Amino acid sequence: MTKVLVVSAIALLSKDKELIPFYKFLFLFFFFTLLACSKVSKDFIVFNKDVKTSSRIDNPNSNVLEVNKMEDFFGDIIDLKGYKILSVQQENLNLDVYFEQVVLAQNFSNLNAYLFIIGFDPKIKAGTILFKTQIDIDPKNSYNMYLEDITGDYDFNIVIQGFLKDKSVLYVFQKSVLNDVSSYRPIFFDKVNGTVLINKYARSSAYEENRSRESYPISLEKYEKVGEDLIISKIEKYEYSNVQGRYCLSSVSEKVGKIDNNIYKTLKNLSKDEVYKFLHGVWYDVHDYNKMHVKDIDEVLFLSFERQSSEINLFRKNSQEVAKIEYISKPAYNTLNVSAKSLFSDLIVYNFWIKIVDKENIEIKIDTSTNSYDNSGFSGTFKRFDENVLNVKKGSSDIYFIPSGNYVYKDKIYDFSYPHLTYIDENKIYYGIFNIFPLKNNFVLEYEIDMGSYKLVESFFLEHSERIVQKQKFSTIILNPIKILKDDVSLVKGQKLKLERIEKI
């Protein structure tokens, strides 16, 4: 580019010598502009919105960016030059009139993750890096960073969850000096081929009224296979010590569980995607189900794993959460780490630890960064849905209906055998899967059929009716095509499918 400028300047000078001073200025201007652009520090903070007044760089190697007003600093999504921003939280960490931004970022050169705290200096009216440390997680996998009072001392902790290869990682940072953001240090860090979980629970009203300090314990569970069909879980429990100012080991226990060896061998040889296919379908909370004695199944928590959309649905009554799967680990024996981000809010990240006991039973622990679901945490045993569960009656009407057997629509046959679906069109046979779940006071049927060159994926509102005539039962399913977009459900233009089945009684 410099050569082009020189040639252009010489050509113009030969035509008009009176403009020599002007062209000299123009040449020097472009030259020094190019020179300045090549010397910007990789740690320099750049804001994504334009600043009306120009900033002057006295020291290009400093970690300070001048801005005209404090308002220019607040509200901006900052960008550390040389880093990819992974997550940003803004909070008043020093309990003064200024806010700080907590940033999880990945360095472009070494691909490592780093934690930054960006503060505002009112004396020079500039944003500055107050804290920086490396975080031992893999940014290519799922991660979660949030600010919460984990230790119960009414101050913000920085919590980072992530994965490193197939290990689960947890960091908890706390200030060692009150109101000094630069004094944050890790009070808990561990990575394990198992689960590292903050055991969240509903704090008492005494904590809410600032009359009691209540911290969250942390559990670390390691898995070890013994013999042909046994797994030993070594569980370490850590409690926060106000005296030592860190999490200390409080107890160690072991739990022996018998596993389905065929399932274990199958999972061990499956890819991540194939493991997820194994989970596909609907699961119900055994404790909720037994507690309700089937009297009010609407109160039972259900989980639905959607293979095609890579989503997890959590639903109870008419409330529903949909989370997009971001990361699935390879099985650690028969345990998976799954991380999913809410479709309704980018700030809500769910971390699932799923222990597969056998084909019909799984144990799940869920942890999230907000109070959006069950006080930020949940643990329970789930069973796979089958027709015995789905066809529970309440009074004289079915709460759930799931089609079973052959249904005919014109010259097409739908053979339902939950969760599998066989689709026959003339002489061609296709195979797929289907799922049913409640949504917006309706029941939704979704299916995915492998058509060879493409996959047919459709969603419907389901209507079902039966009538008996002369020892024959006529079953009818009407499927109204719909489109589901986050929490909005709308009917779409398309032909209703009227599927019919006749059975002899």
Curated annotation (Swiss-Prot):
Q: Which GO terms describe its cellular component?
A: membrane
Transmembrane domains' residue ranges: 18-38
Keywords annotated in UniProt = Membrane, Transmembrane, Transmembrane helix
Q: Where in the cell is it found?
A: Membrane
Q: How does it sit in the membrane?
A: Single-pass membrane protein
Primary location group: membrane
Q: Which NCBIfam families match?
A: pallilysin_like
Q: What protein am I looking at?
A: Uncharacterized protein BB_0038
